Amino acid sequence: MSAAPRIGILGAGGRMGRILIQAVQQAGYQLGAAVVRPESTLIGADAGELAGIGSIGVKLTGSLAEVLEDCDVVIDFSTPAATSEHLKLCREAGVAIVIGTTGMSDEQKAELDETAKHIPVVYAANYSVGVNVSIKLLELAAKVFGDTVDIEVIEAHHRHKVDAPSGTALMMGEAIADTLGRNLKEVAVYGREGHTGPRDRQTIGFETIRGGDIVGEHTVMFIGEGERVEVTHKATNRMNFAAGAVRAAAWVVGREARKYDMKDVLGLNDVQV
């Protein structure tokens, strides 16, 4: 790996893509490529000017295949369909990939797992350092409380977010379920209305809020008799997500082919709970 890895940004024309370009520059790494949709009117524009940091000499392109040779690793915050295509191209080129795309189907996740047998892949629903530390705290709380509490996950995002619950909320739920030896698909309850009957303590509840410009807020409640513990993470801007993804990209270059997550990047798997 070179001292300054060449990082490509996929979905560079979107809000997150522009922040990722800023994050690459702030970290002192090299922007290898910036890719937008093939039909985008932004093709040919300078990526730095688009991101508001001035000209950097990297032009936006609509073809990942044409610029992969300029990248040691790419960061993908696009759509599930686009990510599937990007995985194929990266596998063929032997280029590592960091994926922040949410809303992927089980079939698409299986494609990701297969690709990770051939190239290093980092996949996380949330690249914030704070969120990943929060998940470690959730594992500790779940281990201590066990079956003595009711568990609820509440998440809030801006009105434009199209998937619910958020990938981060599901990631939190999965961490708790795994710690308790449960299958999240079997115990998750999404919203409640009407006559629901008494709450089953084995379930993990999810509630979703959408409105305004909320960047991202997640609270997990461990509710017992006479006391309640809450673990909350609130994001006030998106740079923390971008900085974490760039950190993951620099970390994964040169690693062996397999699937990693932010706990690997941050060394949290070595922290015992």
Swiss-Prot record:
EC number: 1.17.1.8
Function, as annotated: Catalyzes the conversion of 4-hydroxy-tetrahydrodipicolinate (HTPA) to tetrahydrodipicolinate.
Amino-acid positions noted as binding NAD(+) in the UniProt annotation, renumbered to this chain: 11-16, 100-102, 124-127
The species this protein was found in: Acinetobacter baumannii (strain AYE)
Residues reported to bind (S)-2,3,4,5-tetrahydrodipicolinate: 158, 167-168
InterPro entries for the chain: DapB_C, DapB_N, DapB_N_CS, DHDPR_bac, NAD(P)-bd_dom_sf
Gene3D superfamilies found in the cross-reference section: Dihydrodipicolinate Reductase, domain 2, NAD(P)-binding Rossmann-like Domain
Positions contributing to NADP(+) binding: 37
Record family assignment: Belongs to the DapB family.
Name this polypeptide is given: 4-hydroxy-tetrahydrodipicolinate reductase
Keyword Metal-binding in record: no
Enzyme class per UniProt: oxidoreductase
Sample GO molecular function, one term: oxidoreductase activity, acting on CH or CH2 groups, NAD or NADP as acceptor
Name of the gene: dapB
Active-site residues annotated for this sequence: 157 (proton donor/acceptor), 161 (proton donor)
NCBIfam families: dapB
Superkingdom field: Bacteria
GO biological process: diaminopimelate biosynthetic process; lysine biosynthetic process via diaminopimelate
One Gene Ontology term, aspect cellular component: cytosol
UniProt keyword list: Amino-acid biosynthesis, Cytoplasm, Diaminopimelate biosynthesis, Lysine biosynthesis, NAD, NADP, Oxidoreductase
Pathway: Amino-acid biosynthesis; L-lysine biosynthesis via DAP pathway; (S)-tetrahydrodipicolinate from L-aspartate: step 4/4
Catalytic activities: (S)-2,3,4,5-tetrahydrodipicolinate + NAD(+) + H2O = (2S,4S)-4-hydroxy-2,3,4,5-tetrahydrodipicolinate + NADH + H(+); (S)-2,3,4,5-tetrahydrodipicolinate + NADP(+) + H2O = (2S,4S)-4-hydroxy-2,3,4,5-tetrahydrodipicolinate + NADPH + H(+)
Subcellular locations according to the entry: Cytoplasm
